[in-house]
């Protein structure tokens, strides 16, 4: 099978190459079949991959064997986390009607650079980052409060922050779409750079990571739709309060017509696995069902998306401005009741006024309050999930060159800011990432959360 696509070096803007007729209906399934060996370096695993002869996903983090054939339209055949049934098919006329992705900003895309650093195996990577710089101008930030955080009065909504003191697991995915005319250069590098950062700076172990990149020869380590979905299930399996999970995707992203009415703009955001032409994309609803709804209160999920149209790629309903306030204050008036009212009550001091006006907003409802109401009622979650994405839902994300190495602009900015000064709040991290990108890229990183969040708290993972 050939790799997908035609076009330039941005991370998406619809299916790479604008292929029509690929299978969107198999939203939860894997897309099995024979996947030809990818081009790339000699055999070997990049960091705690899918383990050795035993076949399970790496390390002590799970017991999944080799991926099975695709289930009939569901997670493993009998419904996914939370008992979700088979999704509806796409509306007529919406299959792949997207043009090729736009080229990168002038002078920024593509060029040079191999795959960067080799895999780490079971050893910690060599030191690549300098010593942390002096503390930034943001001062010390408070750690998140512990225990159940109630909001909404009699409506009884609640969530729990994670202190990230439990088990740490990571799933890192990089799709360069090797061999296609629409190939990207920086996505595999993004994975290795983030893996190195997590091990050296954040206390993660290679044995507790699954790495999916399309330069590997082990078929279980290729970022196909089936492998990505099964690895997502590995990531959340056995999650406990105060655990810390990382999901990272670098590759092509796009938008598809929304079929369940939860999107304010009428489109679901999606990511494209390397076999998207046969197996279809993975939409935000599916990622949310697996990665967010299955987590217990107090379990942290940090999702990092370096792809086009990724602003709400995990479908988290509370979206933050760079000032940490409502982007669209009139949305509170639109809601009338439900979670937006609950959020307002929470902001007024249900837990001691910790949030003040530092609140997010449910995604803007341009198709009426119905989509807004549905999103806020079904997407708010008691776990501690946040998403940092490379750009707004309407933007493309650049495949960039930094220091002579191909990289995703968002991934570079995140590692740069956190390496320079790890003492960041959610708000300072968002603003400092935007500052790193300012003047070079038009994209604006986005921050969203599964519950109303005090964005002045210390960012931990």
Curated annotation (Swiss-Prot):
Which branch of life, at top level? Eukaryota
Cytoplasm listed as a keyword: no
- Here the segments flagged for biased composition (Low complexity) are 121-131, 138-148
Q: Where is the composition biased (Gly residues)?
A: 1-21, 45-66, 74-86, 105-119
* The protein's enzyme class: hydrolase
Q: Which Pfam families match?
A: Peptidase_C14
UniProt record, GO biological process: apoptotic process; proteolysis
Known function: Involved in cell death (apoptosis).
**Protein name per the record:** Metacaspase-1
The gene designation is MCA1
